[in-house]
From Swiss-Prot:
Database matches in PANTHER family: RHO GUANINE NUCLEOTIDE EXCHANGE FACTOR 1, RHO GUANINE NUCLEOTIDE EXCHANGE FACTOR 2, ISOFORM D
High-level lineage: Eukaryota, Metazoa, Chordata, Craniata, Vertebrata
Post-translational modification: Phosphorylated by PKCA. Angiotensin-2 induced Tyr-737 phosphorylation is mediated by JAK2. Isoform 5 is phosphorylated at 'Ser-390'.
Keywords from the UniProt entry: Coiled coil, Cytoplasm, GTPase activation, Guanine-nucleotide releasing factor, Membrane, Phosphoprotein
Main subcellular localisation: cytoplasm
Species annotation: Mus musculus (Mouse)
InterPro entries (alphabetical): DBL_dom_sf, DH_dom, p115RhoGEF_RGS, PH-like_dom_sf, PH_16, PH_domain, RGS-like_dom, RGS_sf
A GO term from the CC aspect: cytosol
The protein, known as: Rho guanine nucleotide exchange factor 1
Biological-process GO terms, alphabetical: Rho-activating G protein-coupled receptor signaling pathway
Amino acid sequence: MGEVAGGAAPGPPRSGLVSIIIGAEDEDFENELEANSEDQNSQFQSLEQVKRRPAHLMALLQHVALQFEPGPLLCCLHADMLSSLGPKEAKKAFLDFYHSFLEKTAVLRVPVPPSVAFELDRTRPDLISEDVQRRFIQEVVQSQQAAVSRQLEDFRSKRLMGMTPWEQELSLLEPWIGKDRGNYEARERHVAERLLSHLEETQHTISTDEEKSAAVVTAISLYMRHLGVRTKSGDKKSGRNFFRKKVMGNRRSDEPPKTKKGLSSILDPARWNRGEPSAPDCRHLKVEADAEKPGPADRKGGLGMSSRDRTVGTPGQDNPGVSLHPLSTDSVDSREPGVDTPQEPGDTPPQGPTSLEPLAPPESTEDNGETESPEPGDDGEPGRSGLELEPEEPPGWRELVPPDTLLSLPKSQVKRQEVISELLVTEAAHVRMLRVLHDLFYQPMADGGFFPLDELQNIFPSLDELIEVHSLFLDRLMKRRQESGYLIEEIGDVLLARFDGAEGSWFQKISSRFCSRQSFALEQLKAKQRKEPRFCAFVQEAESRPRCRRLQLKDMIPTEMQRLTKYPLLLQSIGQNTEESTERGKVELAAECCREILHHVNQAVRDMEDLLRLKDYQRRLDLTHLRQSSDPMLSEFKNLDITKKKLVHEGPLTWRVTKDKAIEVHVLLLDDLLLLLQRQDERLLLKSHSRTLTPTPDGKTMLRPVLRLTSAMTREVATDHKAFYVIFTWDQEAQIYELVAQTSSERKNWCNLITETAGSLKVPAPASRLKPRPSPSSIREPLLSSSENGTGGAEMAPADARTERLLNDLLPFCRPGPEGQLAATALQKVLSLKQILLSTEEDSGAGPPRDGDGVPGGRAPGPVHTQEIEENLLSLEVAIRQLEELEEEFCRLRPLLSQLGGTLSPNLAAPERSAQTGLS
């Protein structure tokens, strides 16, 4: 078995480790075995020791891949690789780490701590901050340490018995240990390279699952590249789903030279995330041969750089014949993969390829300036060639502008034209991508009957409208460019026509509809591929078409969202390099409209994700306990439908019912409710709990799991920096819930959100009450025509008009439900506190309290009494707060009643006196 797996028969341990065969009858067997064990496994005592030795690590990885689940070990190694990246690269690499090891459908998924799994389920990984990402990685790695330690221990024990691979290769490194470090490291890498090459050739022996075998080999190859080992599979398509790190000095020998296409390091596979192949597309290689000649000289000249050197696009997409010039660092620096995302909260694009849009589409080239040759594989789609970029579009504005004019342009104008050129070319690429999505996927899915038409339209909503809108915008840009002779002076009106006014509102509506359903679409398509082999084969066949440019369907769906994030940056850069004030104002206004559209779309995406999450919770919600309960306060929640609510926040908390009883709950903060859900398998239970309290008549009180926020308030627990109280009033009865968060910052966040949500449900402020409202008569009486009413509104007597106005002002104070007994309730709480304090005095056996004693008897109350005192004080605080609010309302009500008294008859003035008496 070892010979097949390792490529060399393990055989007996090498000379120098066990010099002779020792029989079990030898009396020194155990002592010599222990000595040899320590010497032989000195390189494998811990993962920290072995992970910097490529050859030894290859032996360990080979053993683990054949004997164990390799996910934990590879997860720890890739986490170590991620920690060596810079902040920007690490944030982007976390997405690939998530999709490789943490995602539920990942081939190499590892056990994830519940706290991390919950956060990842409720938050898109690309929206997680860098600090939280690092914390998640640390927690995941810590949870894998036990499994990795067991694998190391097994390897060490098997190595003593000569059952581990690559022993002969490792023995060649022994003489060099402790001598020349540089020479030793070079030999380590050389041996590791040969071992890795053999592993790639025999990867089918790792697992019967070909996908898993390929994923394991790819993960190992990527980490070997991180250690400086040259690999053969570093550029293969199987390398997707793993982040890449550029290894200087070891990469170029195995890769085709990047200057072959005139592209800068922005298209280096190390700069891109999963799902994006790095090998160049050779379909238009011949066309680009002439365009690439001045590339090196242009790169030296800065502004003379070839446009393809700085194009932001997707690896694997060619850019024939389109000259796209670089942007300065103060405009859109396309050298950084993450610049295409506006630096605004919530504007991070959803998971998917890092690039915001593909490269420029095929257009007219130097070899053929009038017609565009169809792409290979598009023969079966007649009439579609015109859907690509119009053949009249020239290869680049620099090549058509007279040299004298080009030299006379100021630097800012050159930058401006470059950004406008990028806007045009990338818009053409986006239109091409949308049409590919429509022609190769949407329409064949409809024709093939894979989905019902209404369901398919829900997966690709408003796709036709988006193609029409973007095509119209592209036509306007092309027309303006041709009219201006490739030096566009005014573009603000074209931008405003697209992003402002009615056109902007329509664009916002259809883009919100499409983007908000992309998560739903990806889940539906993934589920369909798992269940139906015919659909899976159809998708794979469509993705193999040349028009897809080796992009997968899951990479194409997020392109609209990614395109929206590009607009604000491009328009902002155009505005910064526009000197004429009127034109600059138009461009900046268009950029602001783009930001508003993007903000609206992001909010629509979040709302849709919240709705899908609520639907999942509603499906798992178990209302059995509520329906069986006789509590009248819970009767209205027996058919609770949370999908009609708005999700504000959610998370795990600990509910301290009593001092000795704590329950782990998942809390949902909705727009008007707080739900305390208990997990039981896949179900979510809403269950009440009882708590014994001395002051209550029956000795018990029920704590309900559904809480209305109209009377909610929060207080932090002074003795626990993670705990807080949520206080509610149920029918003049205050209930106190003690909840514990995982951190103090989470406690603060929960308190703020509950307070803000409850505050939005309170009675409107006095200023808002002065807004015009329907008159009381219009609420109580059906609408009457002027003929039925006798006179029109203009003929109303002045006194009646004044009465109507005063009644309109009084309307906000008309609320259902009794407000009395507040003072009596507060007094009852005071008496309860007094009773507790007196009972504390009796228990202590002391005499009557003296003046100045803080506590009766001079002693502090016990824990039970302390909790009762605290709860009664909080209840008293609620009652006092309600009394203060009532007093404020009465102060505002009194002058209105006085004014109304002058216009009403004496028999109508009586309610004023009764109201004053009742409120006082």
